[in-house]
Amino acid sequence: MSESHEQLRQRLLQSQQTVLQAVAHMDAERIRVLVNPGWTAQDLLAHLAAAELGHCAVVHRLLVGEDTAIPGFNLDTFNNAEVQARRHLGLDELVAEYNANRAATLDLLASIGDDDWDKAGPHPGGFDTTVESVFRVITIHEKRHLRELQVAH
């Protein structure tokens, strides 16, 4: 791993620990507190778990040279559908999914070669990105949502 890989790995691990700490002591009442319009703390954890898969999919497409732009794609609609699909899951199940998805992200990061780092394309969030940047976006995205999770404390 290059230093950049290791720095990103550490950022991802630290961000994961911060998310897990934010939900670790939430009881059934707190996990159902609205933290933004329409989403509870539990929904937000579901969103973070689902977003991880989406970010990995973007990286995979960039690596093989596939177009990452999806005609008619609406990020808000996608995010809401992913959260809705996980509403039946309990907190422990969501934490397990989040952890499994983060492990897959770390495995993907470890597989990135130096020639792949700068492969670029559009991100579903509406901006241009590179393989490297997608990993950075994951931690930035979580940091933003961590502020919302803190509302439930």
Residue ranges and their predicted role:
Residues S2-A28, A50-R61, R136-I140:
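Alpha-helical bundle segments that constitute or directly flank the non-heme di-iron/ferroxidase center
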Residues S2-L12, G38-L45, L91-V95, V131-F135:
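Amphipathic, non-membrane alpha-helical segments in soluble helical-bundle scaffolds
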Residues E6-R9, Q21-H25, A46, A69-P71, ...:
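Short acidic/polar alpha-helix capping motifs at helix-coil junctions
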Residues I31-T77, L106, W117-H153:
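Short, contiguous alpha-helical
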